[in-house]
Amino acid sequence: IGGLSLAKYKNNPDVVLQLEEYSKNAICFLLFNLVMNGVPAVVIERNVLTQENIAKYRVEVSNKSPQIIKEVCIDEGTYSADTIISNPPYSLSWVPVNDERFNGYKLAPKSKADYAFILDGIYSLKNNGTAVFILPHGVLFRGQAEGDIRQNLIKNNLIDAVIGLPSNLFTNTGIPVCILVFKKNRVNKDILFIDAQKDFIKDKSKNIMTSEQVLKVIDTYNNRSDISKYSRNVSISEIEENDYNLNIPRYIDSFEPEDIPDAVQLAKELNEINRESRTLGLEIAEMLKQLVCTDPDAKKEHDEFVKEFTEFLVSSDSACTIEEQGAVIKKNRRC
């Protein structure tokens, strides 16, 4: 808990961190994590959707004394941030309330507060600020009110990038998620799409992105690179033609065709299996011949079966082999 903020602090120790968390249980782990890593921060126990502040804590780091956590008075004023990093609870139910944070947009549906979190974050950004959200892929293509909100965000040139991540990255959910990057006063008039959904390694029950795979995403984003089957800068007009749907496969074709197997090699393998099968069949036929039947009717039926079975095996052996047929297939195949 708090890993994203810790990573931000590690890259920029001069940053002033304000962390907001609604879960009282998570607050305990968050404060512990900050103290153990020696990271100063303000932590607010807060319901972002209703803007209700419950408690406020400050983690202070001093060279002369241990890290101290002390509760301070709750400030009721608003704030503006240079950077917002958020991994809110996915598709959380909420009670829609129309306030200034959502001006110019429809309200997110009561069954899914994803866009309410997004609009709250954008509202709290400074004029040149950046907000990064980790959310389920549904926010990219769901319709009705969410579709209208997404359309207005695109028209207002606030969406800077859409990054698809592998599934099963987090311990609390196995669904694939995406990163949405928002910027105020953007210069670019397109949206960068990155498809990193296949970039992971298996680690027991989880998927992990290697440092090289993470750096590839970062470099691609920083350079806004177009890479075949991986990333692409898409114009707003093309997105408009797709009815403001941001589903990544609409803009990046990452399909990798499977190699066509060698027909002759497959035929050889099948033919070898057939030979082994016939050899085994003939051995079985020989064993059947050695059986002794005392009942005349049973002996007659047994002898007829052995005869038919042997003739079948012999006739199969003399037929055109699968290997020969495979050669014909390969000869006539058009690639």
Predicted regions and their residues:
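Conserved SAM-binding loop of SAM-dependent methyltransferases across substrates and taxa
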Residues: I1-P13
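Short alpha-helix immediately C-terminal to the canonical SAM-binding loop
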Residues: I27
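Conserved SAM-binding loop
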Residues: L30
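Short loop/turn elements that flank and shape the SAM/SAH-binding pocket of Class I
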Residues: L49-E52
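A conserved structural/catalytic subdomain of Rossmann-like adenosyl-cofactor enzymes
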Residues: K56-C335
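Conserved SAM-binding strand-loop segment of SAM-dependent methyltransferases
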Residues: P40-N47
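Conserved SAM-binding motif I beta-strand of class I
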Residues: V16-E21
